[in-house]
C-alpha cells in the first residue's frame, strides 16, 4: 500500500481580521488551498474552514484517495492564521505540491515561481477563473472528478516506493527494525511552533525518511512501543534513539532520561532506566542514544516493549534536536 502525507492549509487573500483571513504573500488576491505533500506515513489533511471546499471537494477527495489505497487522516486541529512561517517553509521543502484554487482569478505561473524546489506541482481548480498555463490545464480536464482522479493517479505513481510504519532496514544481512519518528509520541509534535517535519534521503536506495526537527520545547517527552514477536528468539537486542543535534542546539546542559520497559504476557514487567548527556553530541552526525537492551523471548511468550526519552527541566528552552526514530537491532 502506498502512503503519503498531505498538509492542507486554507489561505485567504485580503480583508478580515479572523484567524482564517490573512494576506497571502504567494498569490495576490487569490483564495487558494495549498497541500504540502511530503513523505509521511498517512495522508494527513488539515481541513479548510471554507464550507464549500471542506464539505464538498475534500469530502469527495477523501474516499477517492482511499479507493486508490492511499491512507487518509483528517486533522481539524491545524493552527490557522498565525505562525505561517513554518507552513511556507514546509511548502518550500516539499518535493510534491498539490494546490487547490477556489473562487478567484490566479496565475499558475506565480505558484510555480514560488515552488521551484518541488519535483512535482499538481493543481486542482475549484470554481476558479484561471489565466496563463493554469487556464490550459483547467480546460484540458472535463470535470472536477476527472481532475481529482488524475491527480490521485499521479500521486500513486510518484509515491509507489515510499516505505512507512515499522520497517526492517535494508542493509545486507540486517535484522534491524526501525520505528520512525512519525510513529513516536512526542510532546507538542502536532504544533508547528515546536516541531518541523521534513524528509531526508539515505543510501543505498535514496528512500525518503521523515524526521522531526525540534524548534523549541521546555518539556521533552518521546515514547513508542514495539512487539518482540518480530525479533529472533534468544538474540540480544539494543534499543536506541537515533538523533542528531545541529550546531545551534541549546538547552541540553541537563541530561536526558531514558527507560526501556518489557511487559510479559503474564503481566510481569522489567524496567531499565538510565540518563545521558546530549550536549556532548552537538554538531555530530546521527548518534545512538541507548534506552536499554533485551533478549528476545520465545515467540509463544512474546512481549511488548515500550521505550521513552524525556527531560522535564522546564527552565531550559530546548532546541536543535533532530529525531529519525528508534532502532531495535542485534548487538554484536
UniProtKB/Swiss-Prot annotation:
Organism of provenance: Arabidopsis thaliana (Mouse-ear cress)
Domain TIR: 38-163
UniProt-listed PANTHER family: LECTIN-LIKE (PTHR48478:SF1)
Upper classification of the organism: Eukaryota, Viridiplantae, Streptophyta, Embryophyta, Tracheophyta
One GO term of the biological process aspect: signal transduction
Protein's name in the database: Uncharacterized protein PHLOEM PROTEIN 2-LIKE A7
Gene: PP2A7
Disulfide bonds: none
Single Gene Ontology MF annotation: carbohydrate binding
Pfam families xrefs: PP2, TIR
SUPFAM superfamilies given in the database record: Toll/Interleukin receptor TIR domain
Amino acid at each position: 500500500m502506498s502512503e503519503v502525507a498531505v498538509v492542507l492549509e486554507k489561505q485567504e487573500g485580503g480583508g478580515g481580521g479572523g484567524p482564517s483571513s490573512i494576506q497571502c504573500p504567494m498569490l495576490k488576491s487569490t483564495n487558494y488551498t495549498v497541500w504540502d505533500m511530503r513523505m509521511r506515513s498517512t495522508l494527513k489533511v488539515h481541513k479548510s474552514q471554507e464550507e464549500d471546499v471542506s464539505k464538498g471537494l475534500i469530502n469527495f477527495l477523501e474516499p477517492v484517495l482511499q479507493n486508490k489505497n492511499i491512507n487518509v487522516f483528517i486533522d481539524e486541529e491545524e493552527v490557522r492564521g498565525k505562525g505561517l512561517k513554518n507552513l511556507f517553509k514546509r511548502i518550500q521543502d516539499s518535493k510534491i505540491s498539490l494546490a487547490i484554487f477556489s473562487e478567484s482569478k490566479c496565475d499558475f505561473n506565480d505558484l510555480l515561481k514560488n515552488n521551484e524546489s518541488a519535483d512535482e506541482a499538481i493543481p486542482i481548480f475549484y470554481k476558479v477563473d484561471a489565466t496563463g498555463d493554469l487556464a490550459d490545464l483547467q480546460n484540458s480536464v472535463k470535470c472536477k472528478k476527472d481532475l481529482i482522479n488524475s491527480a490521485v493517479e499521479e500521486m500513486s505513481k510518484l509515491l509507489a516506493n515510499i516505505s512507512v510504519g515499522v520497517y526492517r532496514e535494508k542493509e545486507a544481512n540486517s535484522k534491524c527494525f526501525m520505528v520512525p519518528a512519525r510513529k513516536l509520541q512526542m510532546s507538542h509534535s502536532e504544533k508547528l511552533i515546536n516541531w518541523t517535519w521534513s524528509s531526508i534521503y539515505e543510501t543505498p536506495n535514496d528512500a525518503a525518511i521523515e524526521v522531526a526537527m525540534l524548534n523549541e520545547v521546555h518539556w521533552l517527552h518521546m515514547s513508542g512501543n514495539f512487539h518482540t514477536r518480530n525479533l529472533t528468539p534468544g538474540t540480544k537486542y539494543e534499543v536506541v534513539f537515533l538523533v542528531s543535534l545541529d550546531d545551534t542546539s541549546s538547552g541540553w546542559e541537563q541530561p536526558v532520561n531514558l527507560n526501556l520497559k518489557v511487559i510479559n504476557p503474564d503481566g510481569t514487567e522489567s524496567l531499565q532506566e538510565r540518563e545521558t548527556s546530549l550536549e556532548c553530541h552537538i554538531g555530530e552526525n546521527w548518534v545512538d542514544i541507548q534506552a536499554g537492551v533485551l533478549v528476545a523471548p520465545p515467540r509463544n511468550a512474546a512481549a511488548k516493549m515500550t521505550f521513552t526519552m524525556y527531560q522535564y527541566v522546564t527552565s531550559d528552552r530546548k532546541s536543535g534536536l533532530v529525531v529519525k526514530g528508534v532502532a531495535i537491532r542485534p548487538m554484536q
